[in-house]
């Protein structure tokens, strides 16, 4: 309701087509529902009309309130890198489908295996080929320095690489051992998606800021008698 009070400030109003569509929808609600249902939801035709009007105005106001936001985002501000990575997990699944955690000795043996893979990758071998031969699957991910998935230590190590094709040392974590290869310093698709996300955040911040200011400027009266009925 607060948003609709400021509609005139943005020259936002319902068109004749929208008013007719709302009228038709409210009438259909009245036809399709019994008096008992209407009573439960406090939804007589007049109330439904009012709610639909407010919802429509609110949707139109959202666009108006977000207008003027700076939509320019540089590649530098939104840059997303991409990598391939392997996980040598400390958890296995037995024949009954139960998860089992490796013993300390098994973890040490796995570390030796992972180090051998790391050496081969640093020697120039293809990650997918090396992984496939060992029954592993090379995963891909896009990221920046603030990413935390799939693992923050993996992200930090991959983000520290300076050249495409560089490979991390083995990365020991609580869940297993990672190895990553930097495949792109600027993944175009992921970077463009991040730009859209940044613009959306800016719009939301502007919307929320306006709404908060309007709340401060509006005296909200608490109807105690009404609250007692709720």
Regions of interest found by a model, annotated:
Residues 1, 55, 120-124:
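Residues at alpha-helix boundaries and the short loops/turns that link adjacent helices
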Residues 20, 35-116, 132, 149-230:
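PPIase-associated folding chaperone regions across multiple families
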Residues 120-128, 164-166:
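Glycine-centered tight-turn and secondary-structure capping sites
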Residues 127-137:
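Short, well-ordered alpha-helical segments enriched in acidic and aromatic residues
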């Amino acid at each position: 309701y607060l948003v609709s009070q400021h509609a005139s400030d943005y020259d936002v109003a319902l068109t004749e087509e929208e008013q007719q569509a709302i009228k038709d929808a409210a009438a259909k609600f009245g036809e399709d529902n019994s008096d008992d249902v209407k009573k439960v939801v406090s939804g007589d035709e007049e109330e439904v009309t009012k709610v639909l009007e407010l919802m429509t105005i609110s949707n139109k106001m959202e666009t108006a309130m977000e207008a003027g936001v700076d939509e320019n985002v540089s590649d530098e501000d939104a840059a997303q890198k991409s990598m391939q990575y392997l996980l040598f997990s400390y958890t296995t699944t037995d024949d009954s489908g139960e998860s089992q955690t490796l013993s300390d000795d098994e973890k040490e043996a796995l570390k030796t295996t992972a180090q051998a893979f790391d050496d081969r990758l640093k020697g120039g071998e293809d990650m997918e080929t090396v992984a496939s031969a060992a029954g592993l699957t090379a995963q891909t991910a896009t990221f920046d320095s603030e990413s935390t998935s799939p693992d923050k230590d993996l992200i930090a190590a991959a983000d520290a690489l300076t050249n495409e094709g560089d490979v991390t040392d083995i990365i020991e974590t609580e869940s297993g051992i990672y190895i990553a290869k930097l495949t792109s310093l600027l993944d175009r698709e992921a970077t463009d998606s991040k730009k859209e996300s940044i613009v959306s955040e800016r719009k939301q911040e502007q919307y929320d800021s306006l709404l908060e200011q309007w709340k401060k400027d509006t005296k909200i009266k608490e109807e105690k008698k009404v609250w007692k009925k709720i």
